[in-house]
């Protein structure tokens, strides 16, 4: 009889554990769905703003004095939107981005900037895995720096990204003083929220723009 009671208790415990596991799995799926919903809402807001800005550029294209440069800048914006979507979906999948791949993204921006009339060269000193958030902030920083340099006609523009002790540093040296440059509130808030900063600094006896971020899952080199 005692054995039967023990077996009955064990059966109830196993059933309870199975229910707890099932409940935990349901909660996990709900949390994942909620997190993905929040991410997609964030992407939707972000893309809506970028597409709206892009639509304004396209609308004003016939009135511009240099339509070729304007068309090149629109292509630059489209490239940025495409790559940001790529980074977003990598983040949803919990994947990292190799520094070499980020280097390809940055080379694309530099090439399109040159078509827009801005002589640009960007060196990516990262080759190992990077956290998606850090990679996204570096990519957005490069895009906004190029956009500001185009408006200021600050050619040439030299940029280099490297890992230092405990931090990522992304420097840009433009052809004119960037002290009055203003980055978007979205970018500055995201950088600050990640424990980083964007600031003007003396670079090679000239004033440059520097983004610093704390190192996360990145590897040096």
Residue ranges and their predicted role:
Residues 1-36:
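Conserved signal-transmission helix
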Residues 28, 32-38, 117-144, 166:
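Conserved short strand/loop->alpha-helix "switch" segment adjacent to the catalytic nucleotide/phosphoryl-transfer site
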Residues 43-124:
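Conserved DHp (HisKA) dimerization/phosphotransfer helix of two-component histidine kinases, i.e.
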Residues 50-57, 61, 131-160, 190:
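Conserved ATP-binding N-box helix of the HATPase_c
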Residues 156-171:
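Short beta-strand/loop element within the Bergerat-fold HATPase_c
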Residues 171-178, 215:
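Glycine-rich acidic phosphate-binding loop
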Residues 178-210:
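ATP phosphate-binding glycine-rich loop and adjacent ATP-lid/helix-beta elements
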Residues 216-221:
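C-terminal end segment of the histidine kinase catalytic
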């Amino acid at each position: 009889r005692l054995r039967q009671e023990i077996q009955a208790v064990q059966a109830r415990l196993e059933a309870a554990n199975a229910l707890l596991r099932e409940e935990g799995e349901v909660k996990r799926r709900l949390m994942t769905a909620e997190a993905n919903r929040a991410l997609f809402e964030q992407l939707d807001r972000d893309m809506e703003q970028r597409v709206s800005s892009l639509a304004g550029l396209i609308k004003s294209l016939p009135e511009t004095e240099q339509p070729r440069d304007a068309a090149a800048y629109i292509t630059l914006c489209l490239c940025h939107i495409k790559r940001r979507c790529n980074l977003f979906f990598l983040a949803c999948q919990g994947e990292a981005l190799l520094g070499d791949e980020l280097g390809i993204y940055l080379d694309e921006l530099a090439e399109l900037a040159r078509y827009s009339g801005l002589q640009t060269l960007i060196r990516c000193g990262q080759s190992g895995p990077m956290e998606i958030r850090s990679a996204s902030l570096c990519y957005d920083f490069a895009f906004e720096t190029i956009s500001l340099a185009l408006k200021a006609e600050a050619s040439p523009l030299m940029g280099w990204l490297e890992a230092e002790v405990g931090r990522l540093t992304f420097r840009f040296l433009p052809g004119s003083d960037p002290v009055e440059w203003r980055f978007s509130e979205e970018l500055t808030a995201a950088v600050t929220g990640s424990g980083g900063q964007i600031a003007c600094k003396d670079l090679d006896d000239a004033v440059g723009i520097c983004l610093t971020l704390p190192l996360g899952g990145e590897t040096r080199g």
